[in-house]
């Protein structure tokens, strides 16, 4: 979710709306409220940009603020739609790690939708994979397999497992070609 750069709210204001934004009218700013907002910003790694206009933050920074906004109400379930959309690889990894910590340390169930699942695979407990109007559910090991995903899509899908990581790619498995050494310039001995 990209936030309008003209939105005149700071990151801390957005988090505060998660605390009391469902109530009508302004709420007094108390030391306890400020402390709670600061603690939540710290918990998601957003303290450094707490006073920046939220619309000027990067996609990963905005995502942290929005997660803090959702968490400050102490939910049992965190429901996210495409939390990695528009994020670079590093920011996506940081958000995945943040979600893992939220689930394990704060005991909040995390349910999300995502088109790109590769970064999420190492931390998912269960998966419901929906494709072409059908679904498969179970553990990552049960669902994220070439045969299961190929059947769902009606198209070859390859699931690669390398060094404990899983990568899903479209198309049948192809053995990597062994590249011939590139031609080099003649050696000094050949030139003389």
Residue ranges: model-predicted function:
Residues 16, 30-49:
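Conserved ABC ATPase "signature" region
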Residues 74:
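Conserved catalytic motifs of ABC-family nucleotide-binding domains
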Residues 114-115:
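H-loop/switch region of ABC-family ATPase nucleotide-binding domains
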Residues 146, 152-192:
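ABC ATPase nucleotide-binding domains
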């Amino acid at each position: 979710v990209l936030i309008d750069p003209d939105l005149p709210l700071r990151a801390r204001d957005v988090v505060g709306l998660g605390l009391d934004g469902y109530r009508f009218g302004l709420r007094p700013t108390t030391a306890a409220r400020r402390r709670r907002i600061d603690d939540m910003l710290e918990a998601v790694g957003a303290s450094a940009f707490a006073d920046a206009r939220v619309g000027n933050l990067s996609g990963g920074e905005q995502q942290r603020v929005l997660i803090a906004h959702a968490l400050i109400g102490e939910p049992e379930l965190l429901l996210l739609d495409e939390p990695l959309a528009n994020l670079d690889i590093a920011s996506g990894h940081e958000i995945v790690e943040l979600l893992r910590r939220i689930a394990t340390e704060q005991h909040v169930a995390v349910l999300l939708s995502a088109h790109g699942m590769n970064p999420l695979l190492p931390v998912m407990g269960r998966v419901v994979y929906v494709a072409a109007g059908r679904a498969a559910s179970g553990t990552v090991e049960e669902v994220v397999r070439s045969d299961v995903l190929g059947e769902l899509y009606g198209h070859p899908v390859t699931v690669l497992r390398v060094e404990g990581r899983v990568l899903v790619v479209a198309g049948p498995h192809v053995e990597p070609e062994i590249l011939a050494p590139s031609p080099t310039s003649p050696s000094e001995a050949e030139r003389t």
